[in-house]
């Protein structure tokens, strides 16, 4: 049985991926700093997890490991008074450090990148050869890590970067700051859908289980050509305008109203729905993505989920968990607000290291 180390194993994706891999005959070891370990929506998998900062991974942690799936990182921005360099530079440094250790030990390395590196895509579909135009420190960080991996690649080390589309779907540690999840949760609990933008920006979307499927394919794929393999993960059918996602949600939650935050800022008094990257109702991030390469590269790969099916599944999950507006608005399910809460209450340093021992953390 192949042993796989998953960094960021207690996050939104990691909490699904670890169980998925274990159900597909892999032995999983989790490695997570624990920022979101208490952000529980449903019962997470009982994966063996080491609660440590990814900056502290050493060669001993990689003993007996076949592949590292590197999910760990900071998943939202901007961070109020926190300096972007202090937040994101360490994630680039430790991604490169872990990759270097994998190279030395002959371990496969799979990096969780993002389609957000494309930023502004123009009228056509962007693919892996299209110029990257990252619009945020988060997406720039993803691109920089890819560049570092490309520089490390040689005949002894052939890493893989999976550029995930915007994720959606249920997770034991669900995020409600992802567009489809947010709109579905909002409609279910409040009877309203509030859009940050005018709804016209395009977004590629991918279900969390299809992300897991792509990771499994990457682990099994025989890639030894001495280069970084970059693959977009998703399906063209899930390239949707935000307004179309809202309509898919309305179809599953009949009677919910559609409103626009730019027309009435009072709609989001808690500041949870507001996307700080959207200014005056205008979101410059808009792109549609081609996923032809992953289908060509991984034999038999295709996405099983579309957005309407994912919304239907989420609504069923919300009913099963008795999701309320109070739970939906809890900061635990919004990465930016959760991190800022930990920082402002002196649990974290400016470079996002724990300041308190394990027994005093949330």
What annotation goes with each model-predicted range?
Residues 191, 196-362:
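C-terminal substrate-binding subdomain of Rossmann-fold SDR/epimerase-dehydratase oxidoreductases
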Residues 114, 146-171, 181:
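Conserved beta-loop-beta element that borders a ligand/cofactor-binding pocket
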Residues 4-23:
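N-terminal Rossmann NAD(P)H-binding glycine-rich loop of SDR-like oxidoreductase domains
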Residues 54-90, 101-103:
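NAD(P)H-binding glycine-rich loop region in Rossmannoid oxidoreductase-like domains
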Residues 7, 31, 68-71, 109-115, ...:
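SDR active-site strand-loop-helix element
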Residues 120, 133-160, 188-189:
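Active-site Tyr-X1-5-Lys
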């Amino acid at each position: 049985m192949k042993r796989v180390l998953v960094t960021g194993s207690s996050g939104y994706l990691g909490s699904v991926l670890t169980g998925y891999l274990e159900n597909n005959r892999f032995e999983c070891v989790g490695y997570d700093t624990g920022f979101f370990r208490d952000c529980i929506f449903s019962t997470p998998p009982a994966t063996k997890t080491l609660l440590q900062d990814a900056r502290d991974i050493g060669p001993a942690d990689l003993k007996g490991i076949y592949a590292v799936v590197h999910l760990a990182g900071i998943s939202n921005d901007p961070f109020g008074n926190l300096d972007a360099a202090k937040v994101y530079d360490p994630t680039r440094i430790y991604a490169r450090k872990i990759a270097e250790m994998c190279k030395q030990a002959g371990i496969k390395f799979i990096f969780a990148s993002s389609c957000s590196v494309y930023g502004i895509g123009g009228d056509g579909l962007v693919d892996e050869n299209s110029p990257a135009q990252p619009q945020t420190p988060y997406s720039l960080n993803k691109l920089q890590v890819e560049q570092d991996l490309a520089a490390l690649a040689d005949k002894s080390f052939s890493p893989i970067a999976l550029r995930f589309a915007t994720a959606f779907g249920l997770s034991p540690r669900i995020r409600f700051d992802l567009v489809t999840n947010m709109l579905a949760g909002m409609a279910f609990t409040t009877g309203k859908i509030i859009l940050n933008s005018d709804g016209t920006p395009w977004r590629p979307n991918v279900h969390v289980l299809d992300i897991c499927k792509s990771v499994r394919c990457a682990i099994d794929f025989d890639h030894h050509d001495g280069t970084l393999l970059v693959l977009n993960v998703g399906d063209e059918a899930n390239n949707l305008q935000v307004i179309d996602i809202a309509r898919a949600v309305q179809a599953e939650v009949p009677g919910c109203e559609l409103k626009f935050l730019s027309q009435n800022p009072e709609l989001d008094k808690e500041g949870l729905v507001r996307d700080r990257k959207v200014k005056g109702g205008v979101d410059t991030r808009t792109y549609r993505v081609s996923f032809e390469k992953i289908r060509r590269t991984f034999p038999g790969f295709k996405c099983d989920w579309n957005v309407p099916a994912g919304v239907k599944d989420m609504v069923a999950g919300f009913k099963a968990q008795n999701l309320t507006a109070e739970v939906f608005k809890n900061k635990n399910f919004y990465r930016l607000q959760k991190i800022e809460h930990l920082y402002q209450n002196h649990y974290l340093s400016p470079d996002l290291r724990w300041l308190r021992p394990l027994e005093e953390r949330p």
